[in-house]
Amino acid sequence: MAYSTFAAIDIGSSCMEMVIYEISRDYGIKEIDHIRHIFELGKSTYEKREVDFEDVEKMCDILYGFSEIMKDYCIDDYRAFATSALREARNAVRVLDRIKVRTGIDVEILSNSEQRFIIYKALAARSDKFNKIIEKSTALVDVGAGSTQVSLFNNGTLVTTQNVKLGAVRISNMMSALSQNVANYVDIMREYIDNDMVTLNELFLRSKKISNVIFVGDCVPYYVRMKDYFDDGEYITRDRFKAFLDKIYHKSIEQIADIMMLQENQAKLILPSAMVYTRMLDFTQADAIWMPQVTLCDGMAVEHAQKTKKFELKHDFNADILATAKNISQRYSIR
């Protein structure tokens, strides 16, 4: 059996991770190792639009460690992607140069569209579930660190996709000062989220009857730990999801960490992401929610497997492009 080893590196806003995969025609894509470092890069870049020198050096230390692990595994190929935290940094080019000099790793900065498309490919790789769900009107809600992407599907194709600057890390950073000084900061957080979400609903969702909802994002693996709320590991009802939100709604970060068995820097992202997801539920008629644990690294592995002719996606992405273009032309009365 011919197989190759591939390393996917994700420099995110709240953590850095590397996943090692074995890829073959016979057995597809298999994860064999996963290394994760909590590193809040977005905390500085979302506020100051620059990566501090100390953060650059810490990032290089972590990436150098990744490079040594890749040598141990005799990796055939790798990709290293950075997302919104570096995308929004004014000194991003200097940071990438420093990383290359210190670690030998070439890091590429993804645009928002590229990032979401790669995650979308990871979903499409789970074709049996994904293709069945999107036959009916479906909202895919991807809550990232810096923003949220809402994509609508119908009859198996993508209809439209919209982005709002409501990410879990961004919201958490903006609310952190208030949490110490204001008693009702959770209500203020909800108002802040509503400012963009209500507009999104009015412009793009209100006329749509959405039957299914797919939630993806950095915090999804934390949610599915709450096994009492889920059916078959990845499915949860509207009522159970809202019951979960009620359980954590007025809890402190320390209490959420205890309830969900998380570190505090992970727990502080739960309430912001849950409130965005819940607001989307309010705009739909969906009762069942699918929360697959797909990541950017998974999508990177899918892309590599496609490139090396070891994996083929069944979903028709060209049909998505045509359907989306048609939708835009109709919206602006273009013939």
Which residue stretches match the model-derived regions?
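Gly/Thr-rich phosphate-binding beta-strand-loop-beta motif of the actin/hexokinase/Hsp70
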Residues: 2-30, 132-161, 218
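Conserved ATP-binding subdomain of kinase catalytic cores across diverse folds
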Residues: 26-40, 45, 71
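Short acidic/polar alpha-helix capping motifs at helix-coil junctions
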Residues: 8-10, 29-34, 61, 241-245
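Helical "lid/coupling" subdomains associated with nucleotide-phosphate turnover
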Residues: 20, 44-72, 85-93, 101-135, ...
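Acidic donor-binding segment of Leloir-type glycosyltransferases
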Residues: 98
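Hydrophobic residues in beta-strands and at strand termini
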Residues: 11, 39-41, 143, 166
